[in-house]
From Swiss-Prot:
Keyword DNA-binding: no
Residues bearing the modification Phosphoserine: S64, S82
Organism this protein belongs to: Influenza A virus (strain A/Swine/May/1954 H1N1)
Keyword Disulfide bond: yes
Regions of this protein lying in the Virion surface compartment: 1-22
A GO CC term assigned to this protein in UniProt: membrane
Official protein name in the record: Matrix protein 2
């Protein structure tokens, strides 16, 4: 018996699938998981720069300023504002003379 006779057989001048297992819940679950996987893969490829940049740089918020005096908080804010975004999250401090 060949694979062709097990999967597809000619039915009244058309090709059809003679699968009785298509109502099996395992087959339905596998189909849903496969479709979800494909959708997530496509979204990942479309938005990978945005997603991974957000994960890599968005979670790094710097040290907490809780418990510090207001003067030290202001100094920290000024240092952060003096940093200039050069390329893809790489920072450089610019000092004016």
């Amino acid at each position: 018996m060949s694979l062709l006779t097990e999967v597809e057989t000619p039915i009244r001048s058309e090709w059809g699938c003679r699968c009785n297992d298509s109502s099996d819940p395992l087959v339905a679950a596998a189909s849903i998981i496969g479709i979800l996987h494909l959708i997530l893969w496509i979204l990942d490829r479309l938005f990978f720069k945005c997603i991974y940049r957000r994960l890599e740089y968005g979670l790094k918020r710097g040290p907490s300023t809780e418990g510090l005096p207001e003067s030290m908080r202001e100094e920290y804010r000024q240092k952060q504002q003096s940093a200039v975004d050069v390329d893809d999250g790489h920072f450089v401090n610019i000092e004016l003379e």
